[in-house]
Each structure stands twice: as structure tokens, then as C-alpha cells.
């Protein structure tokens, strides 16, 4: 009994830490251009998790952009519906954010985050974020 407990204590944290998300993107885009960000995940399958895009403009609160569900269906914030597309590639373990007609006000830190499908819990995993600056 004690041996199993010790193994659990030693291996459980590493399992948690191995579940990661990493955003990547161009850093800077010009007004009216399109933005494409990639979220690469590891340690879990996109067939079991919802992945969300969230952004935080400088000195402002977090803003929900949208989500891609396990089956590939999406929900996008009403204010961004005509500009945003979220897709994914389960095999590559990547989720993509496409945003058209970029404006200066779209300057923000962009994050991807995830929750296990079928749960109403908190955002389980977060990426470190990627800064996007819109400037001419």
C-alpha cells in the first residue's frame, strides 16, 4: 500500500506538468491585415478537450474570443463573429485562430486554454500567451 502511494506521489505531478499549450504567431501585423495564430498542445488529445482562445488588451480585462469543441464545431463571441475563424488539426495537435481586418484595438496578449469535454470546470491548462501588436 505504501509503495503504491509513493509512486503516485512521485509520478502524479509530472503527468500534470506534461499537459501544455503553446501559442505562436507573427508578433506584429499591420492594420487591415489578417492574423493567424497557432496553439500547439501536448499531453492530451484534442478529441477529448475543448480549446478556447482568449485575449487581454493592454491594461484591460480578459476577453473571450471563441472555442473549438471536440467535434470541430465552434462558438465565437458575437462581437468577433464576422472576423474570426477557429479550426484545428487533431493529428498535429494544433488549434488555429484566424482573425481578419486587424485593427489597432486588436493589440493584445492572446492565450489558448482548455477544458475537458463534458465538464463545467475552470480552464484546466493555459498557454504562456503570445503578444500581438497591430501597428502600421
UniProtKB/Swiss-Prot annotation:
Write the signal peptide boundaries: 1-18
Alphabetic keyword roster? Adaptive immunity, Immunity, Immunoglobulin, Signal
The segment(s) forming the Ig-like domain are 19-128
Q: Which GO terms describe its cellular component?
A: extracellular region; immunoglobulin complex
Q: Which Pfam families match?
A: V-set
Q: What CDD domains does the database record attribute to this sequence? A: IgV_H
Query: Which terms does the UniProt entry file under GO BP?
Result: immunoglobulin mediated immune response
Cited Gene3D superfamilies: Immunoglobulins
Q: Which PROSITE patterns match?
A: IG_LIKE
Q: Which residues form a coiled coil?
A: none
Molecular function terms, GO-annotated:
antigen binding
**Could you identify this protein by its name?**
Ig heavy chain V region XIG8
